[in-house]
Curated annotation (Swiss-Prot):
This is Large ribosomal subunit protein bL36c. It is found in: Plastid, Chloroplast. It holds the Pfam family Ribosomal_L36. It comes from Spirogyra maxima (Green alga). One of its GO terms (cellular component) is ribosome. InterPro entries: Ribosomal_bL36, Ribosomal_bL36_sp. The gene is rpl36. GO terms for molecular function: structural constituent of ribosome. Coiled coil: none annotated. Belongs to the bacterial ribosomal protein bL36 family. GO terms for biological process: translation.
Length: 37
């Protein structure tokens, strides 16, 4: 999980979602997981 100021899609499988008020990226590739911190 990468914590970043700006999250963005890295590949086509990445999806932007909101969880508990945080913007997150979930993907089939675990390296692409990000959350906004």
């Amino acid at each position: 999980m990468k914590v970043r100021a700006s999250v963005r899609k890295i590949c086509d499988n990445c999806r932007l979602i909101r969880r508990r008020g945080k913007v997150m990226v979930v993907c089939s590739n675990p390296k692409h997981k990000q959350c906004q911190g």
